[in-house]
Amino acid sequence: MILLYLLWKILLVIVGAVMITISLCMIVKNEEKILERCLGSVADLCDEIIIVDTGSTDRTKEIARKYTDQIYDFVWIDDFSAARNFAFSKATREYIYSADADEVIDEENRQRFRLMKEAMLPEIEIVQMKYGNQMQYDTVYNYDEEYRPKLFKRLREFVWTEPIHETVRLDPVVYDSDIVITHLPESSHAKRDLANFHKHTVNGYRLPKRLHNMYARELLMAGDNEDLAQAAEFFRDSVNDEARSSDEMLEACCVLAKSARLNKDMAEFFKYTAKVLTTEACSEICCELGAFYEGERDFEEAAIWYYNAVYETQPILQLACGGELGLEGLIRCYRAIGLSRQADIYRQELERRKQEGSL
């Protein structure tokens, strides 16, 4: 074992890898139930711990003091980026690890983290880690596991590339690691996030394409009638905004169609479903049409649209529309019609997809 370790150290020297130093940066508020769980799993992996508190009224700071004396207050301004930037500005080590209080790194992945820390190549500027357990606890994610940027080089070095007509490399060097971070939230943040989206759009902030997609997705997956109604004006503007992409127009129509169906505004409902069907149909709109006809007890027509949602179109916001939700709609409709054998076929398909993890 000692020999293997020595060989490993020699290999690291040969390839130019060095032990890096890491600043852990976190923004927190009222995290007394979970903060110690998070810090206990990551504190010894980092060389500096920076906690930025945005207004805790519980024991959050007291718990944080067990791990660091670098605790800073930040007046909350409904801007997560501003708070994280403030935390990053306090970091002094080579790399910055950004964590949330509802994250945990288990022992297997702590070992992977240590190896990464020992073997980091100096040119790497961002390390992505797998964010796991995302679809538990009523979250609004489409995938149970996905890569997220978590470790960042604090000071970037610019490098010239290409032998003639040389240019500076602008894209960061990103490493996709095998480290898995377990997400263990206490509750859903959807209501908080939707309120923030609404506040910023009302104040005139133009959502970039990524946030436009996330706002629409969170509304479809977790929004209620009130959330959808509050967002309606913003998404109507998106539909008519020539500067928005076709993808954003489709996203807006999905939100507006659902809002109209729930409010029984049929003129608006068919207006926005038609806009999608005349361009490029998607699973979300097919599910909305299925839900409408199911509500009208026209189960044959509803089944057609649920079938289209699963087998003839692709989802653009909510993957479940092209899987679980569409199949469940087919099962309900065929049972209502009295075709139990057909319903069983789709029930078996649903179970198969669940077992394969393809929903």
Predicted ranges, named:
Residues 26-45:
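Short, well-formed alpha-helical segments that are part of the catalytic scaffolds
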Residues 33-36, 58-67:
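Acidic helix N-cap motif at the loop->helix transition within catalytic regions
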Residues 41, 53-62, 76, 100:
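A conserved acidic beta->alpha catalytic loop
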Residues 47-55, 72:
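Short beta-strand/loop segment that forms part of the nucleotide-sugar
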Residues 62-86, 90:
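Conserved donor nucleotide-binding strand/loop of the catalytic core
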Residues 82-88, 94, 99, 105-226, ...:
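Catalytic-site signature of metal-activated, phosphate-bearing donor transferases
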